[in-house]
Protein backbone atom coordinates (compact mmCIF):
# COMPACT_ATOMS: atom_id res chain seq x y z
CA UNK A 1 0.00 0.00 0.00
CA UNK A 2 3.00 2.27 0.51
CA UNK A 3 1.58 4.27 3.42
CA UNK A 4 3.87 6.75 5.18
CA UNK A 5 4.68 5.85 8.81
CA UNK A 6 2.24 8.42 10.21
CA UNK A 7 -0.71 7.00 8.22
CA UNK A 8 -0.28 3.27 8.87
CA UNK A 9 -3.24 3.13 11.26
CA UNK A 10 -5.65 3.76 8.39
CA UNK A 11 -5.46 0.00 7.66
CA UNK A 12 -7.89 -0.59 10.55
CA UNK A 13 -10.12 2.42 9.81
CA UNK A 14 -12.90 0.38 8.15
CA UNK A 15 -11.92 -3.03 9.52
CA UNK A 16 -13.63 -3.63 12.91
CA UNK A 17 -12.19 -7.14 13.32
CA UNK A 18 -8.60 -6.04 13.02
CA UNK A 19 -9.27 -2.85 14.97
CA UNK A 20 -10.27 -5.12 17.86
CA UNK A 21 -7.19 -7.27 17.24
CA UNK A 22 -4.67 -4.43 17.50
CA UNK A 23 -6.30 -3.19 20.71
CA UNK A 24 -6.07 -6.65 22.26
CA UNK A 25 -2.40 -6.77 21.21
CA UNK A 26 -1.86 -3.37 22.84
CA UNK A 27 -3.34 -4.72 26.07
CA UNK A 28 -1.01 -7.72 25.77
CA UNK A 29 2.01 -5.42 25.47
CA UNK A 30 0.97 -3.27 28.45
CA UNK A 31 0.22 -6.26 30.70
CA UNK A 32 3.41 -7.99 29.56
CA UNK A 33 5.49 -4.92 30.35
CA UNK A 34 3.87 -4.58 33.79
CA UNK A 35 4.51 -8.22 34.70
CA UNK A 36 8.06 -8.24 33.34
CA UNK A 37 8.92 -4.96 35.03
CA UNK A 38 7.57 -6.29 38.32
CA UNK A 39 9.77 -9.39 38.06
CA UNK A 40 12.83 -7.26 37.22
CA UNK A 41 12.20 -4.96 40.18
CA UNK A 42 11.72 -7.93 42.50
CA UNK A 43 15.04 -9.33 41.27
CA UNK A 44 16.95 -6.15 42.19
CA UNK A 45 14.90 -4.98 45.20
CA UNK A 46 16.47 -5.20 48.66
CA UNK A 47 13.71 -5.47 51.31
CA UNK A 48 16.11 -5.64 54.27
CA UNK A 49 15.73 -2.02 55.48
CA UNK A 50 12.24 -0.55 54.95
CA UNK A 51 13.17 2.54 57.03
CA UNK A 52 16.42 3.83 55.48
CA UNK A 53 16.32 1.99 52.14
CA UNK A 54 12.62 1.88 51.17
CA UNK A 55 11.32 1.04 47.70
CA UNK A 56 11.30 4.68 46.53
CA UNK A 57 14.98 5.15 47.43
CA UNK A 58 15.75 2.11 45.28
CA UNK A 59 13.90 3.52 42.26
CA UNK A 60 11.09 0.96 42.29
CA UNK A 61 8.26 2.00 39.98
CA UNK A 62 5.64 -0.78 39.82
CA UNK A 63 6.14 -2.24 43.33
CA UNK A 64 4.63 0.91 44.98
CA UNK A 65 1.49 0.58 42.83
CA UNK A 66 1.03 -3.08 43.76
CA UNK A 67 1.62 -2.23 47.43
CA UNK A 68 -0.94 0.59 47.57
CA UNK A 69 -3.57 -1.88 46.28
CA UNK A 70 -2.90 -4.33 49.09
CA UNK A 71 0.04 -6.54 48.04
CA UNK A 72 2.67 -6.71 50.80
CA UNK A 73 4.18 -10.21 50.75
CA UNK A 74 6.69 -11.99 48.52
CA UNK A 75 7.27 -15.65 47.67
CA UNK A 76 10.84 -14.86 48.74
CA UNK A 77 9.61 -14.94 52.35
CA UNK A 78 9.75 -11.20 53.07
CA UNK A 79 7.12 -8.56 53.76
CA UNK A 80 7.31 -4.95 52.61
CA UNK A 81 6.77 -3.77 56.19
CA UNK A 82 9.79 -5.75 57.41
CA UNK A 83 10.20 -9.20 58.90
CA UNK A 84 9.63 -12.63 57.39
CA UNK A 85 6.48 -14.50 56.41
CA UNK A 86 5.78 -18.18 55.77
CA UNK A 87 2.61 -18.24 53.66
CA UNK A 88 2.36 -15.29 51.25
CA UNK A 89 -0.49 -16.88 49.27
CA UNK A 90 -1.11 -16.58 45.53
CA UNK A 91 -1.58 -12.80 45.57
CA UNK A 92 2.03 -11.98 46.36
CA UNK A 93 4.22 -9.63 44.31
CA UNK A 94 5.35 -12.57 42.17
CA UNK A 95 1.78 -13.86 41.89
CA UNK A 96 0.53 -10.54 40.54
CA UNK A 97 3.48 -10.34 38.12
CA UNK A 98 2.80 -13.89 36.91
CA UNK A 99 -0.91 -13.15 36.47
CA UNK A 100 -0.06 -10.16 34.26
CA UNK A 101 2.31 -12.23 32.12
CA UNK A 102 -0.26 -15.04 31.79
CA UNK A 103 -2.94 -12.51 30.85
CA UNK A 104 -0.53 -10.96 28.35
CA UNK A 105 0.01 -14.34 26.67
CA UNK A 106 -3.74 -14.99 26.41
CA UNK A 107 -4.29 -11.51 24.93
CA UNK A 108 -1.47 -12.17 22.45
CA UNK A 109 -3.21 -15.35 21.24
CA UNK A 110 -6.59 -13.58 21.13
CA UNK A 111 -5.08 -10.76 19.06
CA UNK A 112 -3.73 -13.26 16.52
CA UNK A 113 -7.10 -15.04 16.35
CA UNK A 114 -8.96 -11.79 15.71
CA UNK A 115 -6.40 -10.74 13.09
CA UNK A 116 -6.91 -14.00 11.16
CA UNK A 117 -10.68 -14.17 11.68
CA UNK A 118 -11.42 -10.52 11.07
CA UNK A 119 -14.54 -10.86 8.90
CA UNK A 120 -17.00 -11.83 11.62
CA UNK A 121 -20.76 -11.64 11.20
CA UNK A 122 -21.09 -9.47 14.32
CA UNK A 123 -19.20 -6.65 12.54
CA UNK A 124 -21.43 -6.71 9.47
CA UNK A 125 -24.35 -4.34 8.92
CA UNK A 126 -27.29 -6.59 7.98
CA UNK A 127 -28.83 -3.85 5.82
CA UNK A 128 -25.80 -3.06 3.68
CA UNK A 129 -23.58 -6.10 4.19
CA UNK A 130 -20.63 -3.78 4.82
CA UNK A 131 -18.44 -3.80 7.95
CA UNK A 132 -20.02 -1.54 10.54
CA UNK A 133 -19.97 -0.81 14.27
CA UNK A 134 -22.88 0.52 16.32
CA UNK A 135 -20.69 3.02 18.17
CA UNK A 136 -23.34 4.52 20.53
CA UNK A 137 -24.26 0.99 21.67
CA UNK A 138 -20.59 0.06 22.14
CA UNK A 139 -20.15 3.26 24.15
CA UNK A 140 -23.02 2.18 26.41
CA UNK A 141 -21.54 -1.30 26.90
CA UNK A 142 -18.11 0.08 27.80
CA UNK A 143 -19.58 2.68 30.14
CA UNK A 144 -21.67 0.04 31.91
CA UNK A 145 -18.76 -2.40 32.32
CA UNK A 146 -16.27 0.24 33.47
CA UNK A 147 -18.90 1.55 35.91
CA UNK A 148 -19.35 -1.98 37.24
CA UNK A 149 -15.58 -2.34 37.73
CA UNK A 150 -15.33 1.09 39.35
CA UNK A 151 -18.20 0.36 41.73
CA UNK A 152 -16.81 -3.07 42.58
CA UNK A 153 -13.38 -1.66 43.36
CA UNK A 154 -14.79 0.99 45.70
CA UNK A 155 -17.45 -1.15 47.36
CA UNK A 156 -15.47 -4.39 47.77
CA UNK A 157 -11.70 -4.03 47.32
CA UNK A 158 -11.14 -0.71 49.11
CA UNK A 159 -13.62 -1.35 51.92
CA UNK A 160 -12.21 -4.82 52.60
CA UNK A 161 -15.66 -6.37 52.07
CA UNK A 162 -14.11 -8.68 49.49
CA UNK A 163 -10.46 -7.71 49.15
CA UNK A 164 -7.49 -6.52 51.16
CA UNK A 165 -8.24 -2.79 51.42
CA UNK A 166 -5.58 -0.24 50.45
CA UNK A 167 -2.41 1.27 51.91
CA UNK A 168 -3.27 3.82 54.61
CA UNK A 169 -0.80 5.86 56.64
CA UNK A 170 -0.59 8.75 59.08
CA UNK A 171 0.21 12.30 57.85
CA UNK A 172 3.95 11.75 58.48
CA UNK A 173 4.29 8.39 56.74
CA UNK A 174 5.30 6.40 59.82
CA UNK A 175 2.58 3.82 60.50
CA UNK A 176 1.53 2.78 56.99
CA UNK A 177 -0.12 -0.57 56.38
CA UNK A 178 -2.81 -2.18 54.25
CA UNK A 179 -6.23 -1.88 55.85
CA UNK A 180 -9.93 -1.71 55.02
CA UNK A 181 -11.27 1.80 54.44
CA UNK A 182 -14.81 2.99 55.16
CA UNK A 183 -16.34 5.33 52.56
CA UNK A 184 -16.34 9.02 53.53
CA UNK A 185 -19.73 10.40 52.48
CA UNK A 186 -19.39 13.78 54.18
CA UNK A 187 -17.50 16.86 53.03
CA UNK A 188 -14.27 15.25 54.32
CA UNK A 189 -14.50 12.86 51.35
CA UNK A 190 -13.39 15.73 49.11
CA UNK A 191 -10.12 16.13 51.02
CA UNK A 192 -7.51 14.51 48.74
CA UNK A 193 -5.63 13.22 51.78
CA UNK A 194 -8.61 11.31 53.25
CA UNK A 195 -8.51 7.61 52.16
CA UNK A 196 -12.27 7.26 52.68
CA UNK A 197 -12.79 9.51 49.67
CA UNK A 198 -11.24 6.84 47.44
CA UNK A 199 -13.96 4.35 48.44
CA UNK A 200 -16.87 6.80 48.27
CA UNK A 201 -15.81 8.36 44.96
CA UNK A 202 -15.38 4.97 43.28
CA UNK A 203 -18.80 3.87 44.54
CA UNK A 204 -20.42 7.14 43.37
CA UNK A 205 -18.61 7.27 40.01
CA UNK A 206 -19.30 3.57 39.43
CA UNK A 207 -23.01 4.02 40.13
CA UNK A 208 -23.10 6.96 37.72
CA UNK A 209 -21.24 4.90 35.09
CA UNK A 210 -23.68 1.98 35.43
CA UNK A 211 -26.71 4.28 35.08
CA UNK A 212 -25.15 6.21 32.18
CA UNK A 213 -24.25 2.93 30.48
CA UNK A 214 -27.82 1.64 30.77
CA UNK A 215 -29.08 4.98 29.43
CA UNK A 216 -26.87 4.80 26.34
CA UNK A 217 -27.87 1.17 25.78
CA UNK A 218 -31.59 1.94 25.89
CA UNK A 219 -31.79 5.41 24.29
CA UNK A 220 -30.65 6.18 20.75
CA UNK A 221 -29.05 9.59 20.10
CA UNK A 222 -31.14 12.11 18.11
CA UNK A 223 -30.22 12.24 14.44
CA UNK A 224 -29.01 15.86 14.52
CA UNK A 225 -26.78 15.14 17.54
CA UNK A 226 -25.55 11.92 15.92
CA UNK A 227 -24.53 13.79 12.79
CA UNK A 228 -23.32 16.93 14.58
CA UNK A 229 -20.91 15.01 16.82
CA UNK A 230 -20.01 12.56 14.01
CA UNK A 231 -21.07 9.61 16.17
CA UNK A 232 -20.82 7.23 13.23
CA UNK A 233 -17.13 7.94 12.66
CA UNK A 234 -14.53 5.78 14.39
CA UNK A 235 -12.16 8.77 14.56
CA UNK A 236 -14.67 10.44 16.90
CA UNK A 237 -14.14 7.50 19.26
CA UNK A 238 -10.37 7.94 18.96
CA UNK A 239 -10.59 11.66 19.69
CA UNK A 240 -12.85 11.36 22.74
CA UNK A 241 -10.84 8.41 24.09
CA UNK A 242 -7.63 10.42 23.85
CA UNK A 243 -9.42 13.23 25.73
CA UNK A 244 -10.32 10.85 28.56
CA UNK A 245 -6.75 9.56 28.75
CA UNK A 246 -5.01 12.96 28.72
CA UNK A 247 -7.41 14.31 31.33
CA UNK A 248 -6.71 11.33 33.59
CA UNK A 249 -2.95 11.75 33.03
CA UNK A 250 -3.08 15.43 34.04
CA UNK A 251 -5.07 14.56 37.18
CA UNK A 252 -2.71 11.80 38.34
CA UNK A 253 0.34 13.97 37.58
CA UNK A 254 -1.13 16.48 40.04
CA UNK A 255 -2.08 13.97 42.74
CA UNK A 256 1.40 12.44 42.50
CA UNK A 257 3.41 15.68 42.57
CA UNK A 258 1.38 17.51 45.21
CA UNK A 259 0.60 14.36 47.18
CA UNK A 260 -2.68 12.66 48.10
CA UNK A 261 -4.09 9.60 49.84
CA UNK A 262 -3.51 7.68 46.60
CA UNK A 263 0.24 8.40 46.62
CA UNK A 264 1.50 7.65 50.16
CA UNK A 265 4.99 8.95 50.98
CA UNK A 266 6.03 5.55 52.32
CA UNK A 267 5.60 4.09 48.83
CA UNK A 268 6.55 7.00 46.54
CA UNK A 269 8.72 9.19 48.77
CA UNK A 270 7.99 12.68 50.18
CA UNK A 271 6.85 15.59 48.01
CA UNK A 272 9.03 18.64 47.39
CA UNK A 273 6.55 20.84 49.25
CA UNK A 274 7.17 18.93 52.46
CA UNK A 275 10.79 20.08 52.27
CA UNK A 276 9.85 23.62 51.18
CA UNK A 277 7.45 24.05 54.11
CA UNK A 278 9.64 22.34 56.70
CA UNK A 279 6.79 19.86 57.22
CA UNK A 280 8.80 17.11 58.90
CA UNK A 281 11.11 19.57 60.66
CA UNK A 282 8.12 21.17 62.40
CA UNK A 283 6.81 17.78 63.53
CA UNK A 284 10.24 16.78 64.86
CA UNK A 285 10.56 20.05 66.83
CA UNK A 286 7.00 19.59 68.13
CA UNK A 287 7.85 16.12 69.43
CA UNK A 288 11.08 17.36 71.02
CA UNK A 289 9.23 20.27 72.68
CA UNK A 290 6.65 17.82 74.04
CA UNK A 291 9.45 15.66 75.42
CA UNK A 292 11.13 18.63 77.10
CA UNK A 293 7.79 19.65 78.62
CA UNK A 294 7.63 16.16 80.14
CA UNK A 295 10.98 16.83 81.88
CA UNK A 296 13.04 14.75 79.44
CA UNK A 297 16.58 15.87 78.68
CA UNK A 298 17.46 17.11 75.17
CA UNK A 299 19.27 13.84 74.58
CA UNK A 300 16.26 11.76 75.64
CA UNK A 301 13.80 13.87 73.64
CA UNK A 302 15.86 13.64 70.43
CA UNK A 303 16.55 9.93 70.94
CA UNK A 304 12.79 9.27 70.80
CA UNK A 305 12.49 10.76 67.29
CA UNK A 306 11.82 7.85 64.87
CA UNK A 307 14.68 7.39 62.39
CA UNK A 308 12.06 7.16 59.65
CA UNK A 309 10.75 10.66 60.47
CA UNK A 310 14.27 12.10 60.61
CA UNK A 311 15.07 10.53 57.22
CA UNK A 312 12.11 12.25 55.56
CA UNK A 313 13.61 15.54 56.77
CA UNK A 314 16.63 15.22 54.46
CA UNK A 315 16.89 17.14 51.17
CA UNK A 316 18.21 14.07 49.31
CA UNK A 317 14.69 12.63 49.50
CA UNK A 318 13.17 15.69 47.81
CA UNK A 319 12.00 14.58 44.32
CA UNK A 320 12.68 18.05 42.88
CA UNK A 321 16.43 17.74 43.61
CA UNK A 322 16.94 15.21 40.80
CA UNK A 323 17.96 16.49 37.37
CA UNK A 324 16.02 15.69 34.21
CA UNK A 325 18.76 13.55 32.67
CA UNK A 326 20.12 11.95 35.84
CA UNK A 327 19.11 8.35 35.34
CA UNK A 328 18.95 5.87 38.18
CA UNK A 329 17.60 5.56 41.69
CA UNK A 330 18.20 7.89 44.64
CA UNK A 331 20.59 5.27 46.04
CA UNK A 332 22.73 5.74 42.91
CA UNK A 333 22.95 9.44 43.72
CA UNK A 334 23.82 10.28 47.31
CA UNK A 335 24.18 6.62 48.34
CA UNK A 336 22.43 4.12 50.57
CA UNK A 337 21.50 5.59 53.95
CA UNK A 338 23.14 3.62 56.76
CA UNK A 339 22.19 5.53 59.90
CA UNK A 340 21.15 8.83 61.46
CA UNK A 341 24.10 10.63 63.06
CA UNK A 342 21.77 12.64 65.32
CA UNK A 343 20.57 16.23 65.45
CA UNK A 344 23.37 18.83 65.58
CA UNK A 345 22.84 21.79 67.91
CA UNK A 346 25.23 24.70 67.24
CA UNK A 347 26.12 27.29 69.90
CA UNK A 348 28.34 30.37 69.91
CA UNK A 349 30.75 31.20 72.75
CA UNK A 350 27.99 33.16 74.50
CA UNK A 351 25.85 30.01 74.67
CA UNK A 352 23.23 31.11 72.12
CA UNK A 353 21.69 28.25 70.13
CA UNK A 354 22.26 28.75 66.39
CA UNK A 355 20.29 27.30 63.51
CA UNK A 356 21.76 26.55 60.07
CA UNK A 357 19.71 28.10 57.27
CA UNK A 358 18.52 25.25 55.08
CA UNK A 359 19.14 24.96 51.35
CA UNK A 360 16.08 25.79 49.20
CA UNK A 361 14.97 23.15 46.71
CA UNK A 362 16.31 24.74 43.51
CA UNK A 363 19.82 25.54 44.75
CA UNK A 364 22.84 23.35 44.09
CA UNK A 365 25.06 25.41 46.39
CA UNK A 366 24.05 27.72 49.20
CA UNK A 367 25.99 29.88 51.69
CA UNK A 368 26.39 28.39 55.17
CA UNK A 369 24.64 30.86 57.47
CA UNK A 370 23.85 30.32 61.17
CA UNK A 371 21.12 32.45 62.76
CA UNK A 372 19.86 32.73 66.34
CA UNK A 373 16.29 32.22 67.53
CA UNK A 374 15.35 35.74 66.35
CA UNK A 375 16.68 35.16 62.84
CA UNK A 376 19.74 37.39 63.35
CA UNK A 377 22.88 36.15 61.56
CA UNK A 378 25.47 35.19 64.18
CA UNK A 379 27.92 33.02 62.23
CA UNK A 380 28.77 31.85 58.73
CA UNK A 381 31.37 30.16 56.59
CA UNK A 382 32.67 33.21 54.66
CA UNK A 383 33.67 33.31 51.00
CA UNK A 384 36.45 35.84 51.78
CA UNK A 385 38.16 35.13 55.05
CA UNK A 386 39.98 38.49 54.98
CA UNK A 387 36.68 40.39 55.31
CA UNK A 388 34.86 37.97 57.59
CA UNK A 389 33.22 39.06 60.84
CA UNK A 390 31.08 36.03 61.60
CA UNK A 391 33.39 33.09 60.81
CA UNK A 392 33.11 29.94 62.93
CA UNK A 393 36.58 30.67 64.30
CA UNK A 394 35.77 34.29 65.25
CA UNK A 395 32.41 33.48 66.83
CA UNK A 396 33.66 30.31 68.51
CA UNK A 397 30.91 27.99 67.30
CA UNK A 398 30.64 24.49 68.77
CA UNK A 399 28.33 21.61 67.86
CA UNK A 400 26.76 18.91 70.01
CA UNK A 401 24.70 15.95 68.79
CA UNK A 402 21.47 14.71 70.34
CA UNK A 403 19.94 11.36 69.37
CA UNK A 404 21.32 9.12 66.63
CA UNK A 405 24.76 7.53 66.47
CA UNK A 406 26.66 10.59 67.78
CA UNK A 407 24.34 11.18 70.75
CA UNK A 408 26.17 13.22 73.41
CA UNK A 409 29.26 13.87 71.23
CA UNK A 410 30.40 17.49 70.88
CA UNK A 411 33.02 19.19 68.67
CA UNK A 412 34.74 22.55 69.01
CA UNK A 413 37.33 22.08 66.24
CA UNK A 414 36.36 24.72 63.58
CA UNK A 415 36.98 22.38 60.62
CA UNK A 416 34.67 19.71 62.08
CA UNK A 417 32.03 22.28 63.09
CA UNK A 418 32.03 23.70 59.53
CA UNK A 419 31.73 20.19 58.08
CA UNK A 420 28.59 19.48 60.09
CA UNK A 421 27.19 22.99 59.43
CA UNK A 422 27.46 22.31 55.69
CA UNK A 423 25.71 18.98 56.11
CA UNK A 424 23.01 20.52 58.33
CA UNK A 425 22.02 22.70 55.33
CA UNK A 426 20.63 19.51 53.82
CA UNK A 427 18.40 18.67 56.80
CA UNK A 428 19.01 15.88 59.27
CA UNK A 429 22.48 14.33 58.92
CA UNK A 430 22.81 10.73 57.75
CA UNK A 431 25.73 8.42 57.10
CA UNK A 432 25.52 7.38 53.44
CA UNK A 433 27.21 4.40 51.79
CA UNK A 434 28.41 5.46 48.33
CA UNK A 435 30.80 2.54 47.78
CA UNK A 436 28.30 -0.33 47.32
CA UNK A 437 26.56 1.11 44.23
CA UNK A 438 29.44 3.41 43.20
CA UNK A 439 27.07 6.33 43.85
CA UNK A 440 28.27 9.60 42.32
CA UNK A 441 27.01 11.98 45.03
CA UNK A 442 24.63 13.81 42.68
CA UNK A 443 20.99 13.85 43.81
CA UNK A 444 18.41 11.82 41.89
CA UNK A 445 14.63 12.13 41.78
CA UNK A 446 12.26 9.56 43.29
CA UNK A 447 9.61 7.59 41.36
CA UNK A 448 7.26 10.44 42.34
CA UNK A 449 9.25 12.78 40.08
CA UNK A 450 9.53 10.31 37.20
CA UNK A 451 5.82 9.46 37.27
CA UNK A 452 4.85 13.14 37.29
CA UNK A 453 7.20 14.08 34.47
CA UNK A 454 6.12 11.14 32.31
CA UNK A 455 2.40 11.64 32.79
CA UNK A 456 2.49 15.44 32.40
CA UNK A 457 4.54 15.07 29.18
CA UNK A 458 2.27 12.44 27.66
CA UNK A 459 -0.84 14.34 28.78
CA UNK A 460 0.36 17.37 26.82
CA UNK A 461 1.13 15.19 23.79
CA UNK A 462 -2.26 13.49 24.00
CA UNK A 463 -3.98 16.86 24.39
CA UNK A 464 -2.69 17.83 20.94
CA UNK A 465 -3.68 14.37 19.68
CA UNK A 466 -7.23 15.00 20.87
CA UNK A 467 -7.36 18.39 19.10
CA UNK A 468 -5.90 16.86 15.93
CA UNK A 469 -8.27 13.90 15.66
CA UNK A 470 -11.25 15.92 16.90
CA UNK A 471 -10.67 18.47 14.14
CA UNK A 472 -10.23 15.71 11.55
CA UNK A 473 -13.52 14.05 12.42
CA UNK A 474 -15.55 17.28 12.83
CA UNK A 475 -14.24 18.88 9.62
CA UNK A 476 -13.78 15.73 7.56
CA UNK A 477 -15.94 17.04 4.74
CA UNK A 478 -13.94 20.27 4.60
CA UNK A 479 -10.62 18.41 4.46
CA UNK A 480 -11.89 15.88 1.91
CA UNK A 481 -13.71 18.45 -0.22
CA UNK A 482 -16.85 16.28 -0.33
CA UNK A 483 -20.14 17.14 1.36
CA UNK A 484 -21.08 14.06 3.46
CA UNK A 485 -24.80 14.83 2.94
CA UNK A 486 -24.51 14.93 -0.85
CA UNK A 487 -27.32 12.68 -2.16
CA UNK A 488 -26.77 13.03 -5.91
CA UNK A 489 -24.77 10.32 -7.62
CA UNK A 490 -21.35 11.70 -8.47
CA UNK A 491 -19.17 10.01 -11.06
CA UNK A 492 -15.61 10.89 -10.06
CA UNK A 493 -13.67 12.26 -13.00
CA UNK A 494 -16.80 12.95 -15.08
CA UNK A 495 -16.67 16.70 -14.43
CA UNK A 496 -13.82 19.16 -14.50
CA UNK A 497 -15.21 20.65 -11.27
CA UNK A 498 -16.31 17.95 -8.84
CA UNK A 499 -20.11 17.63 -8.70
CA UNK A 500 -20.76 20.47 -11.18
CA UNK A 501 -22.69 19.04 -14.19
CA UNK A 502 -22.09 22.22 -16.20
CA UNK A 503 -18.39 21.35 -16.47
CA UNK A 504 -18.80 17.90 -18.08
CA UNK A 505 -15.64 16.60 -19.72
CA UNK A 506 -15.89 16.06 -23.48
Swiss-Prot record:
Segments traversing the membrane: 21-36, 101-115, 140-156, 203-218, 237-252, 457-472
Subcellular location: Plastid, Chloroplast thylakoid membrane
Any Pfam family hit: PSII
Entry GO MF terms: chlorophyll binding; electron transporter, transferring electrons within the cyclic electron transport pathway of photosynthesis activity
Membrane topology: Multi-pass membrane protein
InterPro entries: PS_antenna-like (IPR000932), PS_II_antenna-like_sf (IPR036001), PSII_PsbB (IPR017486)
SUPFAM superfamilies: Photosystem II antenna protein-like (SSF161077)
Key words, A-Z: Chlorophyll, Chloroplast, Chromophore, Membrane, Photosynthesis, Photosystem II, Plastid, Thylakoid, Transmembrane, Transmembrane helix
Cofactor binding remark: Binds multiple chlorophylls. PSII binds additional chlorophylls, carotenoids and specific lipids.
Gene3D superfamilies to which the protein is assigned, alphabetical: Photosystem II CP47 reaction center protein
Domain of life where this protein originates: Eukaryota
Chief location bin: plastid
GO cellular component, one term: photosystem II
GO biological process per UniProt: photosynthetic electron transport in photosystem II
Described purpose of this protein according to its UniProt entry: One of the components of the core complex of photosystem II (PSII). It binds chlorophyll and helps catalyze the primary light-induced photochemical processes of PSII. PSII is a light-driven water:plastoquinone oxidoreductase, using light energy to abstract electrons from H(2)O, generating O(2) and a proton gradient subsequently used for ATP formation.
Quaternary structure note: PSII is composed of 1 copy each of membrane proteins PsbA, PsbB, PsbC, PsbD, PsbE, PsbF, PsbH, PsbI, PsbJ, PsbK, PsbL, PsbM, PsbT, PsbX, PsbY, PsbZ, Psb30/Ycf12, at least 3 peripheral proteins of the oxygen-evolving complex and a large number of cofactors. It forms dimeric complexes.
Xref: PANTHER family: PHOTOSYSTEM II CP43 REACTION CENTER PROTEIN, PHOTOSYSTEM II CP47 REACTION CENTER PROTEIN
Protein name: Photosystem II CP47 reaction center protein
Lineage: Eukaryota, Viridiplantae, Streptophyta, Embryophyta, Tracheophyta
Amino acid sequence: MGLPWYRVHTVVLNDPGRLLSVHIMHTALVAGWAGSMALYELAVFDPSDPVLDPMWRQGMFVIPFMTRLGITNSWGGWSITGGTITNPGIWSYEGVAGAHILFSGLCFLAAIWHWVYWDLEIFSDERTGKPSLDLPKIFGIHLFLSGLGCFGFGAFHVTGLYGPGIWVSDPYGLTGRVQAVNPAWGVEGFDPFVPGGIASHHIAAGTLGILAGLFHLSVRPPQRLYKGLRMGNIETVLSSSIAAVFFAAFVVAGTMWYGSATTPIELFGPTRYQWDQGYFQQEIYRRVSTGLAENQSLSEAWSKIPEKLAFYDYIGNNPAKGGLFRAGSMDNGDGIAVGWLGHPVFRDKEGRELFVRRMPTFFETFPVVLVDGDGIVRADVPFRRAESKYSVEQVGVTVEFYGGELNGVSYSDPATVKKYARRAQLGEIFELDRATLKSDGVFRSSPRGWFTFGHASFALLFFFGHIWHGARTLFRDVFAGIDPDLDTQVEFGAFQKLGDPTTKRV
